[in-house]
Amino acid sequence: MKLIARTLLLISLVSVPALGRAQQIGQQIGGTGYGPMSTGYVDFLAGLAYTDNALLTAGGQRNDGIGTVGFDADYSRQGTLSINLLGNIDRLQYIRNSFSGSFYGNFNGDALWGTPSDPLQWLLSDSFGEGMVDPLAASTPANLQWVNQVTTGPYLNLNFGLRNRFTLYGLYGRSSYQTSPYSSQTYEGGAEITHKLAGSTSLSLQASDARTAYLDPAALIGSPGHGTAYYIKQAQIEFQGRYVRTNVTLGVGYNIIDYARHQQGAPYYNVQLSRSISPFTTVFVGALSEYASFGGSMQSPTALLGAEGGALQGAGFITSSPFKERMVTAGADYNRGLTTVTLSGIYQQDLYTQQSQYDNRDATADLTLGRKLQPTLFIQLQVYGSYEDYSHYHAHTHSITAMLTLSKQLARAAFGLYAGGTQQSGSPGVSSFNAASYHDIEVGVYFTYDLLGQANSSGGAGLGMGVPGLPGVP
């Protein structure tokens, strides 16, 4: 189950095209005619942290320093070439060699050439993330491996006037795992009919068919005589509306998975709603139910919730079995000049198609308070809690993290100090999981420099520096 890092963002506010999401390509029919528009930032970041429990164990604690260097992005450019970047990738080095140096982070990026009115659009996207070897063990480099997924392919648009468009697309995806034998190739084709209603609203009918083939034939569970691939088919109808104070997406349909010649289906839904209830306050709710794989889950809405140095794991721990993902999220954001408050939570279930003993549920909550002390001086307090449960084994963990950050903005650069701690308790039940129980205290300093755009300085930039075990990176 994924552990949500940093302040949780509304799933409808961050949208990266991915396999199975053709509707995110050129959703608006017609065009404004305006030139490229850019928002957000790309930062260089570096930091040094001290932890009194680098191994994240209950006993035999070992202190260590952790150096970090990398980049942090929350950037969007819209135009003939549209670019979206969200996340971070860091290089970690443990000074006392508690673990070997490694890359760590969670990143989603895509580049889309062409506009909805063009007959051809081309997508290139990449997702980089971390997978858990033991789902309940501490998130140290010894229990993590990186996973990368690249997706590319064309979208062919046939526009009928300014209100109707027919789209065909074909995508190729490649998932690569650092050590696990689950690397695969995905071929997906689909079609979409979109009709613009009134204003900034549209209605679309979508269908897709994806084939995922493992490079190692033994990776398909129950595969003898059943080939090396599985299939996911999906059909849905979707409404999108953009109003002055409200954004809404409502998609309903049905999806089917065929794995090792065993077929099963379930309803699909995707609900995203955000509303500004005052000039300073926005509330949001969301819900999602779909079939996914580990690599594909990194591109799902719940994988895009971390930014500005945070990092996430993909859904569950690394296995070749796809799963049914169900998620509900809600929260509110208050921003009134000197003060910011964000409260959010997520409840999620992963139901595995072939390994039901790994079915799990996860609940997370996050509260972030920020205050501008001076025009360029910020303070922020973040409190984060999570609960994860594998009911088949009666195994679970629960944790709480708190961090205080003080930051100073100097033109394109920012400096910060932070201190905090994590307390986690776990029980392995009747499983072989290493359900970690530990506590640790961390302090650190960081530096960021805006390479592109400018980060929104609210006291939290660089929080946790993407270091495993530090607050914000459970």
Predicted regions and their residues:
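Gram-negative and organellar
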Residues: 22-474
